[in-house]
Amino acid sequence: MPELPEVETVRRGLQPAMEGFRIDRAVAHRENLRFPLQKDFAARLTGQTVTGLGRRAKYLLADLSSGDVLLMHLGMSGSFRVIGADGETTPGEFHYPRSEDRTHDHVVFEMASGARVVFNDPRRFGFMKVFPRSEIETEPHLKGLGPEPLGNAFDASLLAKACAGKQTSLKAALLDQRVVAGLGNIYVCEALFRAHLSPKRKASTLANRKEEPTDHAVRLTEAIREVLGEAIKAGGSSLRDHRQTSGELGYFQHAFKVYDREGKPCPTCGGTVQRFVQNGRSTFWCPKCQK
């Protein structure tokens, strides 16, 4: 599933074709993706101008001139193609080639920019929903999300308070979208390595008794920002189905220090990168470097 950097890369790729332009026609080729599409889905989009294209955690949010918001989630295999006069691009191109089967082109936006924006999703774990912007604070998919890790509000103090008293593992806490939004398995493994912190460490060790940040929290906050920033610059790194809107692959996977490197030497100490299953997910780490 795409994580924050991949979704941000897709957002940036879609902006030139969508932001500031009217949706001349919206077409849904099926009644449902992961969830049923609203019966008035296409009607609420057709004729509306996309006044802004943002992101919250792993969700894309298109502000519409009607006062509605179009929420989009890529799911496991969803991708967008932008078809214009200059050819076809795929924002947020990911590792594996996208599906060439056009029967999985489920939603199409015909833009006043002259572009056609096509959502293709073979597995149909992605979804879309239109709702009034006035309900954004209560929208179930967005309600309760933690701070954006690249936002100004996210710092060591905030992370420490969120983890204070938590007896869960540090990795489990970071994957909790209520603690910090948008992080997934790849970037949690990489950030913990850069911060020299064990994924098995208790989350509570990020705070002292006064719920003030420890040095661990400071290092981890810096590592999270660093790894996400580098991944966005590289165009993302999700491993299976996801790709950039430009049709090019994301290259941050070539900079992985531990993720998917089981049995290979640690780039810091020369020890062996190990893998173990933690809460049903593979965790990659260096036991010598991460304490």
Curated annotation (Swiss-Prot):
It catalyses: Hydrolysis of DNA containing ring-opened 7-methylguanine residues, releasing 2,6-diamino-4-hydroxy-5-(N-methyl)formamidopyrimidine; 2'-deoxyribonucleotide-(2'-deoxyribose 5'-phosphate)-2'-deoxyribonucleotide-DNA = a 3'-end 2'-deoxyribonucleotide-(2,3-dehydro-2,3-deoxyribose 5'-phosphate)-DNA + a 5'-end 5'-phospho-2'-deoxyribonucleoside-DNA + H(+). A zinc finger (FPG-type) spans 257-291. Its cofactor is Zn(2+). GO terms for biological process: base-excision repair. GO terms for molecular function: 8-oxo-7,8-dihydroguanine DNA N-glycosylase activity; class I DNA-(apurinic or apyrimidinic site) endonuclease activity; damaged DNA binding; zinc ion binding. Its EC number is 3.2.2.23, 4.2.99.18. InterPro entries: DNA_glyclase/AP_lyase_DNA-bd (IPR015886), DNA_glyclase_Znf_dom_DNA_BS (IPR015887), Formamido-pyr_DNA_Glyclase (IPR020629), FPG_cat (IPR012319), MutM-like_N-ter (IPR035937), Ribosomal_uS13-like_H2TH (IPR010979), Znf_DNA_glyclase/AP_lyase (IPR000214), Znf_FPG/IleRS (IPR010663). The active site is at 2 (schiff-base intermediate with dna), 3 (proton donor), 58 (proton donor), 281 (proton donor). Pfam families: Fapy_DNA_glyco, H2TH, zf-FPG_IleRS. DNA binds at residues 104, 123, 166. Binds 1 zinc ion per subunit. PROSITE patterns: FPG_CAT, ZF_FPG_1, ZF_FPG_2. Keywords: DNA damage, DNA repair, DNA-binding, Glycosidase, Hydrolase, Lyase, Metal-binding, Multifunctional enzyme, Zinc, Zinc-finger. SMART domains: Fapy_DNA_glyco, H2TH. Monomer. Involved in base excision repair of DNA damaged by oxidation or by mutagenic agents. Acts as a DNA glycosylase that recognizes and removes damaged bases. Has a preference for oxidized purines, such as 7,8-dihydro-8-oxoguanine (8-oxoG). Has AP (apurinic/apyrimidinic) lyase activity and introduces nicks in the DNA strand. Cleaves the DNA backbone by beta-delta elimination to generate a single-strand break at the site of the removed base with both 3'- and 5'-phosphates. Belongs to the FPG family. This is Formamidopyrimidine-DNA glycosylase. It comes from Rhodopseudomonas palustris (strain TIE-1). The lineage of its organism: Bacteria, Pseudomonadati, Pseudomonadota, Alphaproteobacteria, Hyphomicrobiales.
